[in-house]
């Protein structure tokens, strides 16, 4: 296909498909039709900036429809037709557009797409991209502008930047530093043990988490005098675990990060700080409390074949005045952003509905997203049957998928 002189796109709130078309087709000129509503959402600015900054697009970008004196509402037939007869007609003449342009009718209101497509003497062909949930291959349907007869397909590249997809919706993207413990060679085996321990009543086979976690969790939730700096957890508090084996196990945990002696062992037991204000202390507590589960899920996704460019962790998506929450895991598969909220367990203060609300809050105004809760089996096991049924019903009503992560095979429901 020869280079396209002029490519028109009707911007909407969901523009990933059109963005990918621009990258693959490389038209000389991209013309963004921007209604007043879309301009108010700032979608045109994000689209233009992302395309210009992609380093893959080399054409020019033009905008029409939102400027003062030539605004397009795009919802009523008479208003659209009047705009087409005046503003659009003048615009095409100024840009020497005559039977040398392509209109992508994927976005916008149906009536706007229909009336634009009906303009004679402008279009070489029409393009349409269906939302292809079940296909790894993304393609564009080509249509004759008058008869609407199919003219073939254009297969798009499977290479696409997840960050670019996010930039179409977020005004700013911040990357939070990952927990450095995940780089330690012992962290993954310990994460596997932590996962296994959720279904264990007593320590066995060198896995002492069933003895350690209740003691740590009790210490972390207890109130202490303001002037107290440290806590001593004596060996007998860890129940049936033998002190010599317990020391070796706790040393492994302590050595996951340089704690500079603030968490240490002595002849009486384990010494912990009361406060975890310092970064390394906070990283250690966070990993033991839940970051281990994120590390495990990330590893399983990679083992299931998810590519680096399809996967992001720890992003904060800022939209307007909303600072947004940090996302656990983000995927891009089959032309769709997938927001994953992970939960290793629920604290006594948490409710089953909390992760549901969190994944909705993270993904608001982010286009046609897929929302997924990846939960450790212990969450379902600990819930009352009626409570769990109600939770499943609420998730289904909000089109949120639940994955009980019993193993890496369970995560294939996310990528198949």
Whereabouts are the PLM-identified features?
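Short Gly/Thr/Asp-enriched flexible loops that form oxyanion-binding sites at enzyme active sites
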Residues: 108-123, 388-391
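Beta-rich, aromatic/charged-enriched effector core domains that present basic-aromatic interfaces
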Residues: 107, 133, 137-180
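A broadly used, surface-exposed interaction patch
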Residues: 29-102
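N-terminal beta-strand-loop-alpha-helix module at the start
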Residues: 1-50
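Intrinsically disordered, low-complexity Ser/Thr/Pro/Gly-rich regulatory segments
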Residues: 165-416
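Structural motif
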Residues: 9-13, 34-37, 105-107, 316, ...
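Short, acidic/small-residue loops that bind anionic groups at enzyme active sites
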Residues: 101-102, 120-143
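Hydrophobic beta-strand segments of well-ordered beta-sheets in folded domains
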Residues: 3-9, 25-33, 59-63, 100-103, ...
